[in-house]
């Protein structure tokens, strides 16, 4: 599955949500689909999207918060899984795109998921009540819709190909 295809599949459902992305490919591909004022791109903040999303979810419980994370990023901040599980915000959906490499820094470094580490199992072991791992666009869309309806903290790991955008440039006219 390509990340862009997965993002395109859920893009319409993101309209009413606060969306926090990690740096690089996720941010660029989401922006290319069409910037919205409720999209917050954490450029140059690898590892912090999950923490930022958690803070927003806790402080604004009336909003649905979607974090679009990456395997390298969450591996830099595994403690956020236990903190999310501790507070269990029902309005937080944590999507982790797992391509098994550090794509945004050159793709020359593999992550621990390339050798068997299972991020969905880590989230479940940390206490996240709803976890899933998917590898097709249809399964991703279905799992995302189920997360929206569940009103429960969810970590959704999407296995994707290590392919990035043609350009990482984002202009949000700030």
Question: Where do the model's predicted regions map?
Answer:
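Thiamine diphosphate
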Residues: 3-8, 32-174
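A short, flexible N-terminal coil/short beta segment enriched in small residues
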Residues: 1-19
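Acidic-glycine-rich active-site phosphate/pyrophosphate-binding loop
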Residues: 16-35
